[in-house]
């Protein structure tokens, strides 16, 4: 190796030429690959493999060895006689040979903790299966065979493979690594965090003063039946003389206030609640029916309906019921005639039963289009543009 020390003093180009001279691939020589190329070139010149020195320097690592053992039975010198129609039988000497000679276990441990960090103990079991290759037909040897009872009859050895040698290996980990326990949630049900309930701030309520009012009875002797809505929203009739609102033990409670004033403003004047006055019973009232009154005066959450039914009626007519009667057009027409010039007034819907002329239809169409698209504005714009164009053409001299 002393004669090859000159390779370290060669330049990159000279070293590349030396590699090509000895049949090595022309790899560019750099500072990082220079030492590797010099080592390969020395191995090529001396004829020594590159990895021989490395393999010799390394320590021998113990490897697991598997020992296979087999026991071959020698044929007996005694004559063999075949007995048809009988099951397979073995002598006690053959059983002893199989149990003592043909089965052995080699168990040893390898200390390879430096490689994998754990020691593995390997157990190899070698069995001789050559003696189990007999045919289904039995062969009986002329030797004294002891008589076995059913309880003491020897058990036949069952083979697990077709090969002559059965190898069983058991691997057991001596030191198992300890894994950290994963944080498994106890429940997958989301629990809402408990937040203390906020205090409720009740708004001030304004209860108007309840004053009894009189109801004017009609001169015709008719009295309007009292309409009262019970808790079950059912309406029934009873004689009006049996109920007196002044004698009720519980005063009616007003739960509705129509005031929309701000909190800091002055309180509005409470509107008095009208109450009906008892009217003597007449024959016509009995014919109409009687109003069943509840035991206590109940004021529902419908003050508008109560005010509607509390309005006085001078005509003395009975309660109005829904009927499909024709609507009178006279008050509607008079209303629109009074408010004709009002900005919010609508035109009356008048149905013309006679046939409308085409000119009237065209006029109505033009009016509707003018209201929707402003046709007058566009018409004036087009006419003005045409007039301006004509004036420009007349005043411009001909070229």
Swiss-Prot record:
InterPro entries tied to this protein: LEM/LEM-like_dom_sf, LEM_dom
Localization in the cell: Nucleus inner membrane; Cytoplasm; Nucleus, Nucleoplasm
Organism: Drosophila melanogaster
Major subcellular site: nucleus
Observed phenotype of the null mutant: Viable and fertile, with no obvious phenotype. In the salivary gland nuclei of third-instar larvae, there are increased deformities in the nuclear lamina with 1 to 7 abnormal O-shaped Lam-containing structures. No significant decrease in adult survival, however double mutants with either Ote or MAN1 do not survive to the adult stage. Double bocks and Ote mutants larvae have small brains, their imaginal disks are reduced in size or absent, and only 10% of second-instar larvae reach the pupal stage. In bocks and MAN1 double mutants, pupal survival and larvae development is unaffected.
Protein name: LEM domain-containing protein Bocksbeutel
Key words of the record: Cell cycle, Cell division, Cytoplasm, Endoplasmic reticulum, Membrane, Mitosis, Nucleus, Transmembrane, Transmembrane helix
Region Disordered, residue ranges: 49-103, 119-141, 233-287
């Amino acid at each position: 190796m002393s004669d090859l020390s000159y390779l370290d003093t060669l330049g990159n180009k000279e070293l590349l030429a030396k590699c090509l001279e000895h049949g090595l691939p022309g790899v560019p020589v750099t500072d990082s690959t220079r030492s590797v190329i010099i080592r390969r070139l020395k191995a090529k010149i001396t004829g020594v493999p590159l990895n021989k020195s490395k393999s010799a320097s390394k320590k021998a690592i113990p490897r697991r060895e598997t020992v296979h053992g087999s026991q071959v039975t020698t044929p007996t010198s005694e004559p063999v006689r075949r007995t048809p129609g009988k099951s397979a039988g073995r002598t006690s000497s053959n059983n002893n040979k199989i149990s003592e000679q043909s089965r052995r276990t080699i168990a040893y441990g390898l200390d390879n903790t430096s490689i994998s960090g754990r020691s593995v103990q390997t157990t190899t079991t070698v069995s001789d299966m050559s003696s189990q290759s007999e045919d289904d037909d039995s062969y009986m040897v002329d030797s004294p065979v002891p008589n076995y009872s059913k309880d003491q009859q020897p058990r036949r050895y069952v083979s697990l493979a077709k090969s002559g040698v059965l190898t069983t290996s058991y691997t057991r980990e001596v030191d198992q690594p300890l894994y950290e326990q994963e944080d498994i949630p106890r429940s997958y049900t989301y629990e809402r965090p408990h937040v203390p309930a906020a205090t409720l701030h009740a708004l001030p309520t304004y209860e108007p003063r309840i004053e009894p009012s009189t109801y004017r009875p009609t001169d015709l002797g008719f009295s309007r039946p009292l309409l009262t809505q019970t808790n079950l929203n059912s309406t029934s009739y009873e004689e009006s003389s049996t109920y007196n609102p002044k004698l009720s033990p519980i005063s009616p409670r007003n739960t509705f206030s129509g005031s929309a004033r701000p909190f800091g403003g002055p309180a509005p004047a409470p509107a008095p609640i009208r109450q009906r006055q008892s009217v003597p019973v007449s024959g016509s009232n009995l014919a109409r029916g009687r109003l069943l009154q509840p035991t206590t005066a109940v004021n529902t959450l419908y003050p508008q309906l109560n005010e509607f039914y509390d309005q006085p009626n001078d005509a003395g007519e009975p309660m109005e019921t829904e009927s499909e009667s024709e609507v009178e057009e006279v008050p509607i027409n008079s209303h629109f005639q009074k408010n004709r010039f009002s900005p919010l007034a609508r035109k009356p819907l008048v149905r013309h039963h006679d046939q409308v002329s085409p000119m009237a239809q065209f006029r109505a169409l033009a009016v509707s289009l003018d209201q929707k698209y402003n046709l007058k504005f566009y018409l004036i714009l087009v006419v003005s543009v045409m007039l301006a164009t004509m004036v420009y053409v007349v005043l411009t001299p001909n070229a």
